[in-house]
Amino acid sequence: MRVHAAHLLVPVPSTPRRHATLRFTVSAAATSVNVNQADAARKQAVIVGGGLAGLAAATHLASLSVPFTLLEASDRVGGRVATDEVDGYLLDRGFQIFLTAYPECQRLLDFQALRLQPFFPGALVYLGAGESGSPFHMLSDPFRFPIRSLSSVFSPVGTLPDKLLVGITRLRAAATPDDVNLSSPETTTARHLEKLGFSPSIVERFLRPLLAGIFFDTALDTSSRLFELVFKRLVLGDNALPEAGIGAIAAQLADRLPAGSVRLNARAASIDPSSGVTLDTGEAVSGELGVIVAVEQPEAEKLLPQLPARPKSKKPAERSTVCLYFSADRAATNVAPSYAPAGKVLVSVSLVGSFAEREDGELAGEVVRELGGWFGAGEVASWAHLRTYRIGFAQPDQMPPTEPAGRDPRVGDGVYVCGDHVRRRDGVWEEGGRGPGQGWGAVPILELRNLASVREDFH
């Protein structure tokens, strides 16, 4: 087992704890199958799935005054973007970060209201005790913290040419338009880093662990195009966590939707372009203006048999992660004060893979033992295991070759698909709020305007 990232989310004693109340404008449950006549007569679109993709699609439809009903199978919106409160700690369901540089996020979200807590633009790299005596070595962004980054020049994490190459790659990424990046020759990220000229030292000590934690892919088989997209976002913005947890992103989107437009505990069983959506209860929900399927890839393939089949040579890649949370008394870093009660520390540990053969308690014990070698046995002795989250489908298949023309979001007459597994026909991955490569995936705005035009025909 290899721990790829340990994050200490720590309270600042002088900062009072503020609990944000997450309010949703949603129906408490799909309680009634007897839709009143006025609702039955209303022409509407139907969105299947209340994750970020579905919420983003709903937000766009609302902005165009297109009536819709969003159907969410669970008892809450947000999908994988959720936060649980346990004994005063805020536990995101899987360690997630918010990248502020995504244009779609900037258009849809109120950053100030989220009270974002940014990460320092750098990393402490664990190499074990060496000649310097310290097991950790700092790498920081020289363009944001030039003085502090001087120590990075002399760190054993890569060679001096490697560090110069990081700076060159940073400048190039910031200046290159997305359409140029995403139409470039495609290979794996591992091969791409080699072609760029990075040494095995910096790849194995820094880039592979970093990118494996982002893509949940230790082999770095992820598309080089996606690497360029994500690296650019890392360069141009902050990594941050909302004060009330990552679930506050979904809460903010849901709170802006029209009252009664979201139905919870409403699971879609089938989709018929001519009649709309049938729930597992047998209720039919009409979708005269179209149906937008905004669920993760495996579920989308069940609901939409007409989706293009994957190439037989390309098996779905597992993109699983396990996130373990511990409470502690002392801190090594200070990232998100609001995630822990006063005087306590929240430790988040991310593992790449499913570890299905290990029970939660066994896995937590292994993690504590390994990190005892990082921070010292005395430091981790006070850690108490809070909860383990196993995310089986954390990201979709992102290995090359990706679809050269992208997938048309229209998969049938009046039926659209969106989500983090969809790439638009212009070659652009839809951008994300959960983290790199995991995003809104909303239907392109042109298609939504077409729905608005259709709506006018019904009036």
Model regions and ranges:
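N-terminal chloroplast transit peptides
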Residues: 1-23
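Glycine-rich FAD pyrophosphate-binding loop
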Residues: 62-86
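N-terminal glycine-rich dinucleotide-binding loop that anchors FAD/FMN and/or NAD(P) in oxidoreductases
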Residues: 84-107
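Mobile amphipathic helical/loop "lid" adjacent to a hydrophobic cofactor/ligand pocket
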Residues: 102-106, 110-224, 231-236
